[in-house]
From Swiss-Prot:
CC terms in the record's Gene Ontology section: nucleus
Residue numbers of Phosphoserine PTMs: 135, 159, 161, 165, 191, 194
Natural source organism: Homo sapiens
Annotated function: May be involved in transcriptional regulation.
Subcellular location(s) of the protein: Nucleus
InterPro entries, alphabetized: BTB/POZ_dom (IPR000210), SKP1/BTB/POZ_sf (IPR011333), Znf_C2H2_sf (IPR036236), Znf_C2H2_type (IPR013087)
Organism phylogeny: Eukaryota, Metazoa, Chordata, Craniata, Vertebrata
Metal-binding as UniProt keyword: yes
Domain of life, per lineage: Eukaryota
Crosslink position(s): Glycyl lysine isopeptide (Lys-Gly) (interchain with G-Cter in SUMO2): 4, 290
Protein's name according to its UniProt entry: Zinc finger and BTB domain-containing protein 44
Length: 570
């Protein structure tokens, strides 16, 4: 008689093991490592940390067993970012909200927990909407629904909503009016890779029946006030801008996936808009932020708007020819241009100077940034107001980026800069697929596909699609008087016109950063006699031809208004 074998596989064993390990950690039993984060002590087990994080495995595997150094300091991690990751290692449950998402993402990247970092990135990029059903859900669930492998989104108020393992769309029962923002922001994500069954949490009396609510709420519009305040694209609420309120528009509804589609991901971004109405500006609590996605029609509408010169103005006004002039002087006039077909496209895309200066013009990017809510409020704590300029006695650039350390004079510039570190580029070109962080960058990019050239050099009639290309043309062409090469490399004797080129040259010679700092603190890199009388006379005698230039300084740039006032066409 043959030997009979029996194999038993327990699906709850891994869950029980994690629960018991977490109990041992809370009681302080068998903890063999101490982690210090910002002077706060955490006790844990080496085997659990090494199994969850490649960073800890590299740190702990190489240690000798008889070594008494069991304290590990994490200098680049905050307490608010480390606690959710430690709980995730022992419970397979990640609890994040809009207040600690940046800290958790930075800590997960530093600790090489890439799956958690990917989840945080998806949470930042996606739009999480909550649907409010009219009828109360059933309290009891079938046995098949209790064993459902779909993960749950659990809010801080205790409601649990079923959702697919890829976290596509969610529901919850929640009061709409005057609810705490902190409760609306917070949620708990069950890891799809963990063996923890989500059916263990179905004992709550507020569990939603996904199959029942699907047929009831299929055609119900979703209340956009329940969206997170900084969801895609970071909570831009157009309802508080009366000038940009559109006319009657069809109400869009959110179609929830059926029971057979629970394993599929929803669309990349879910757009939900109720009927657009103008709301009066009240308190901050009354203004409800909705989730918007820039559709192809809206992108086309944004691109077709007039490109005013004020929107294309740059902060570097010292290198702009005739910085006292308005950039409308650079716009192509259909009557004065001789390009032909290009002017027809420009005449359609660009208004006259009177229309660009009208009072009903839409606000620029800086004004729109005032109404944007960002998840970086913890890092932005300036001494001055967001709408005020720095005081004369204070620092020139009080707003500093916590990631790279770049400082800015305005809070709007810092907010726009933080989008670069987030990696979110919500504006995508529908022709070539290139993505941009700002809507204005997409607008200028679309002009290249349409063949519209909005800026023209009034000296050589060259046309450009952006003001940056025009500035580059003025630098590399012979339209401006060449600057003298006043920066000299003491190593090889090379001369340069600006310090930036000298820095690039010194880096090519493998100069360290400290050496560069000491090098530029002294004035030895400047030629001693670069501003003598002979060089000034040489620059004044520069052949300007028929173009009128001012000669009140050694380095001049053409003043376009003078050339235009003579009535000479290029």
């Amino acid at each position: 008689m043959g030997v009979k074998t029996f194999t038993h596989s327990s699906s709850s064993h891994s869950q029980e093991m994690l629960g018991k390990l977490n109990m041992l950690r809370n009681d302080g039993h068998f903890c063999d490592i101490t982690i210090r984060v910002q002077d706060k002590i955490f006790r844990a087990h080496k085997v659990v940390l090494a199994a969850c994080s490649d960073f800890f495995r590299t740190k702990l595997v190489g240690q000798a067993e008889d070594e008494n150094k069991n304290v590990l300091d994490l200098h680049h991690v905050t307490v608010t970012g480390f606690i959710p990751l430690l709980e995730y290692a022992y419970t397979a449950t990640l609890s994040i909200n809009t207040e600690n998402i940046i800290d958790v993402l930075a800590a997960a990247s530093y600790m090489q927990m890439f799956s958690v970092a990917s989840t945080c990135s998806e949470f930042m990029k996606s739009s999480i909407l909550w649907n409010t059903p009219n009828s109360q859900p059933e309290k009891g669930l079938d046995a098949g629904q209790e064993n459902n492998s779909n993960c749950n989104f659990t809010s801080r108020d205790g409601s649990i909503s079923p959702v697919s393992s890829e976290c596509s769309v969610v529901e919850r029962t929640i009061p709409v009016c005057r609810e705490s923002r902190r409760k609306r922001k917070s949620y708990i994500v069950m890891s799809p890779e963990s063996p923890v069954k989500c059916g263990t949490q179905t004992s709550s009396p507020q569990v939603l029946n996904s199959s029942a609510s699907y047929s009831e709420n299929r055609n119900q519009p979703v209340d956009s006030s329940l969206a997170f305040p900084w969801t895609f694209p970071f909570g831009i609420d157009r309802r508080i801008q009366p000038e940009k309120v559109k006319q009657a528009e069809n109400t869009r509804t959110l179609e929830l996936p059926g029971p057979s589609e629970t394993g599929r991901r929803m669309a990349d971004y879910v757009t939900c808009e109720s009927t657009k109405t103008t709301l009066p500006l009240g308190t901050e609590e009354d203004v409800r932020v909705k989730v918007e996605r820039l559709s192809d029609e809206e992108v086309h509408e944004e691109v077709s708007q007039p490109v005013s010169a004020s929107q294309s103005s740059l902060s570097d006004q010292q290198t702009v020819p005739g910085s006292e002039q308005v950039q409308e002087d650079l716009l192509i006039s259909p009557q004065s241009s001789s390009i032909g077909s290009v002017d027809e496209g420009v005449s359609e895309g660009l208004p006259t100077l009177q229309s660009t200066s009208s009072t009903n013009a839409p606000p620029d990017d800086d004004d729109r940034l005032e109404n944007v809510q960002y998840p970086y409020q913890l890092y932005i704590a300036p001494s001055t107001s967001s709408t005020e300029r720095p005081s004369p006695n204070g620092p020139d650039r009080p707003f500093q980026c916590p990631t790279c350390g770049v400082r800015f004079t305005r809070i709007q510039n810092l907010k726009q800069h933080m989008l670069i570190h987030s990696g979110i580029k919500p504006f995508q070109c529908d022709r070539c697929g290139k993505k941009f962080t700002r809507a204005y960058s997409l607008k200028m990019h679309r002009l290249k596909h349409e063949g519209k050239r909005c800026f023209r050099c009034q000296i050589c009639s060259a046309t450009f699609t952006s003001f940056g290309e025009y500035k580059h043309h003025m630098r590399v062409s012979r339209h401006i008087i060449r600057k003298p090469r006043i920066y000299e490399c003491k190593t090889c004797g090379a001369m340069f016109t600006n310090s930036g080129n000298l820095i690039v040259h010194l880096r090519s010679l493998n100069h360290e950063a400290s050496e560069l700092a000491n090098y530029f603190q002294s004035s030895d890199f400047l030629v001693p006699d670069y501003l003598n009388q002979e060089q000034e006379e040489t620059l004044v005698q520069y052949d300007l031809g028929e173009h009128g230039f001012e000669s009140n300084s050694s380095v001049q740039m053409p003043v376009i208004s003078q050339y235009h006032s003579k009535g000479k066409e290029p």
